[in-house]
Regions:
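Short, mixed-charge low-complexity intrinsically disordered segments
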Residues: 52-57, 100-126
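Intrinsically disordered, low-structural-confidence terminal and linker regions
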Residues: 1-27
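A generic structural signal for solvent-exposed, polar alpha-helical segments
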Residues: 9, 18, 59-62, 88, ...
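Feature targets compositionally biased, intrinsically disordered low-complexity regions
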Residues: 14, 25, 42, 71, ...
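Acidic, low-complexity, intrinsically disordered interaction modules
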Residues: 25-105
């Protein structure tokens, strides 16, 4: 694993009205089968694992991610771009406000295994 900090962080604006400022703090390079854990100041965790074919961007959506008090959601913006977001359990109202401000369409919560099976698997494939 190699981390190259961006000092000072590069800042850029984004969002539906360019009203969100993001700070790019650096670049991390992972080799296949290396993992990093991202943590919030309140203890939420997210594991990202590098494989030789790409990345596991999240732990299992309907098991381990939930145990970290995070919930995956698929959203679509006004330009038609899709994003997978991870919402902290205790920050649902902040997420709802953000989604409304950014005109995000909630497509599907990704943490309900039964719901995902109903949505994506044909009868008899379960």
């Amino acid at each position: 694993m190699k981390f190259l900090p961006e000092v000072p962080p590069r800042e850029f604006t984004t969002g539906v009205n360019n009203n969100v400022t993001i700070k790019d703090c650096g670049c991390m390079t992972l080799m296949p089968d290396e993992q990093i854990t991202l943590e919030t100041e309140t203890g939420y965790e997210l594991d990202v694992t590098r494989k030789n074919w790409g990345f596991y961007a999240t732990p299992s959506l309907n098991k381990r991610l939930i145990s970290f008090d995070l919930h995956g959601v698929l959203v679509r913006n006004v330009q038609g771009h899709y994003f997978v977001l991870l919402v902290e359990t205790l920050k649902r109202s902040e997420f709802d406000k953000y989604a409304q401000e950014q005109n995000l369409e909630l497509i599907l919560w990704l943490d309900d295994g039964v719901g995902l099976d109903k949505q994506f698997l044909r009868a008899g494939e379960r």
